[in-house]
Structure formats: C-alpha cells, structure tokens
Amino acid sequence: MDLPVNLTSFSLSTPSPLETNHSLGKDDLRPSSPLLSVFGVLILTLLGFLVAATFAWNLLVLATILRVRTFHRVPHNLVASMAVSDVLVAALVMPLSLVHELSGRRWQLGRRLCQLWIACDVLCCTASIWNVTAIALDRYWSITRHMEYTLRTRKCVSNVMIALTWALSAVISLAPLLFGWGETYSEGSEECQVSREPSYAVFSTVGAFYLPLCVVLFVYWKIYKAAKFRVGSRKTNSVSPISEAVEVKDSAKQPQMVFTVRHATVTFQPEGDTWREQKEQRAALMVGILIGVFVLCWIPFFLTELISPLCSCDIPAIWKSIFLWLGYSNSFFNPLIYTAFNKNYNSAFKNFFSRQH
C-alpha cells in the first residue's frame, strides 16, 4: 500500500503502539509494498541534495576565508560567521529534521536528543538570520558613511555584531531549557517541536525574525535613498547641453583669442568616485537580493510560528514541513548570493581547486 503523497508521510514501516493495538489484522500480515511512493522518493532525494549542497557550499566558503590571507578582515569575518551558522544548520539540524520527516513527524529518539536538536535548530537558524542583518548593516554604513566608517571602526563594529548575534541566538534557543519556558517534547504523542507557550512564541519569533526583518528593511530603504541622492548630485554637477558650438572672443584688440566650445556636456566627477559608485551599486544589489531571499524563505514559517500558538490553530503538517524546509533553504542561498557578487571569491575558488590537483 503506497503511503499518502506528502512530506509528512515518509513514515517508517514500524507502526505506532496505538496502531499496533487497534489496526493490525490478517490483511496487515501480508508482505508490505515499497515504503515510499515515487513522489516521496523524489522529495527525499531533493531534500538530501539540499542538505549536502548546503553543507558543502558553506564549508567551501569557510575554508576559503580561512585559507586566503586577504580575507582575514572585514567584511569577510561577517561572511565567515554566516557560513559557520549555515554549515551548522546543514550538519546538525537538517539531517535530524529529515529523519523526523521520514518518521511521519513522530520523534522516536528520546527527550534529550529532542531538546538538543530544538536548541541547535533555534540557535543556528537565529544566528544565520542575524548574520544576514549584520552584513546588511555593514554594507549600509560602508556606503553611507565611508569617510567615518574606517577600517579600525569597521573591524570593531563587526566583531561586536558577531558577538551579539551568537549571544542573542543562545538566549533565545536556551530559554525553554534554562527557565522551563514551555515543553519541546511530548512522550505520549511522540512530538518534538519548538515550545508552543504563547509568551515564548512571541519572544522567540520577534527576537529571531521580526526584529531583524525590521532592521534589514530599514537598512535597504536607507541604501536606496542614498543611491538616489548620489544620482541626483551627479546630475547637478554637470553642465547643460549646448546645441551649437559657441565662440568666445576677447574684447581686447591685442592679442585676439578665440575659444570654441564643442562639448555637449561637461561632468565634474573624479575617477575614484566612479569606481566607488560602481562598487556601491554592486553592494546595494547584493544586499537587496540577500534580503529579498531571506524574507521569502523565512516569512511563511515565522508567520505560522507566531499565529499558531496564539490562536490555537491547527496548521496541516504538510504545510509546516514545507515552510520549515523553505526556511532551511535560506542557508543554501546565502553563500551563493554573497559570492556571486564578489569577484575575489570566484578567483579564490579557482585557486583553491587548482591547488588540490
């Protein structure tokens, strides 16, 4: 008998105790058919690929930063912190989440491992989100305050942001364990999930998502305004077009000089400013895509995480799984987006692989 086609139906062949007592009959003693439908195998393969690719890509970014000496500075320390959080998501969180899906969202690995998994899940995902926020803030200050935001200041601020990111993530993830703020494991129903206590739901979702969401949206709005202001300033520094050549003659009889102006537009713009503007435009585009993907990946999950405990809504398990894995996929997209807009990473990757042969 094929299992229902959804993420939550990748159940193992061993039935639950209730099913054993009430549903086993003569017909159930016949040989079982394949555990997973074709669609289930495809989904399982896709999720397995997502886990492996997320781990490999973030590990590559992290290894490159550690190996290349020129990357041992800002903003690459922020990228390294993001890669650490994302590689931990792929190594510690996603595999157990995949096992959870295969078990039909029934947790059969005990209370301690459940608590550890949930704590790692909240810690690593929250750190990943706040690392994106830190990168956006660093880009914002480097674009809008490049004279004041010196290398020393930038290094100090980035280290503080990294420390605050992991400290806040640890507080949010460990609060249920340290303060008894709700329960993550139910032995009777074999459930393992983030605490459903309404007060903790508000605290965790605001601290892990809604607050950084407000920060990144504000930051990108300011970056957009700064970019528009620069374009406006560049226009005011240019001379209006001249339709025809103009001759200017000196009024003095001796000697007589004639000036002919044939250029349509004269723009006063140092070459250094042009290079800086191009760099800032790439940075603004990178931040915009990074923020956009971050919002699209995580907002469905955090909306349900906030609404469900407050209204006691019963959200179908299939949607919980989809929203959860959509959020996990953000850890796959983060390094792709950042390295795609940085030519130094592309050349560093080529050198990294060429040295292996």
From Swiss-Prot:
Substituting residue 305 to A results in: Increased G(i)/(o)-coupled receptor activity
Q: Which residues lie on this side of the membrane: Extracellular?
A: 1-36, 104-114, 177-198, 313-314
Residues of this chain annotated as glycosylated in UniProt: 6, 21
Q: What InterPro entries would the database entry show?
A: 5HT5A_rcpt, 5HT_rcpt, GPCR_Rhodpsn, GPCR_Rhodpsn_7TM
Q: Which GO terms describe its cellular component?
A: dendrite; perikaryon; plasma membrane; postsynaptic specialization membrane
GO-annotated biological processes: adenylate cyclase-activating G protein-coupled receptor signaling pathway; adenylate cyclase-inhibiting serotonin receptor signaling pathway; chemical synaptic transmission; G protein-coupled receptor signaling pathway; G protein-coupled receptor signaling pathway, coupled to cyclic nucleotide second messenger; hippocampus development; response to estradiol
> Consequence of mutating residue 121 to A?
Abolished G(i)/(o)-coupled receptor activity
> Does the keyword Transmembrane feature in the UniProt annotation?
yes
What outcome follows a substitution of residue 226 to V?
Strongly increased G(i)/(o)-coupled receptor activity
What are the disulfide bonds? 114-192
User: How the protein sits in the membrane?
Assistant: Multi-pass membrane protein
Q: Which UniProt keywords apply?
A: Cell membrane, Disulfide bond, G-protein coupled receptor, Glycoprotein, Membrane, Receptor, Transducer, Transmembrane, Transmembrane helix
Localisation per UniProt entry: Cell membrane
Main location as per UniProt:
membrane
Consequence of changing residue 142 to A: Does not affect G(i)/(o)-coupled receptor activity
The residues that cross the membrane are 37-63, 77-103, 115-137, 156-176, 199-220, 288-312, 315-339
Query: Which domain of life does the protein's organism represent?
Result: Eukaryota
Do the record's keywords include Transmembrane helix? yes
Q: Describe the family membership recorded for this protein in Swiss-Prot or TrEMBL.
A: Belongs to the G-protein coupled receptor 1 family.
Q: What does this protein do?
A: G-protein coupled receptor for 5-hydroxytryptamine (serotonin), a biogenic hormone that functions as a neurotransmitter, a hormone and a mitogen. Also functions as a receptor for ergot alkaloid derivatives and other psychoactive substances. Ligand binding causes a conformation change that triggers signaling via guanine nucleotide-binding proteins (G proteins) and modulates the activity of downstream effectors.
Which protein are we looking at? Answer: 5-hydroxytryptamine receptor 5A
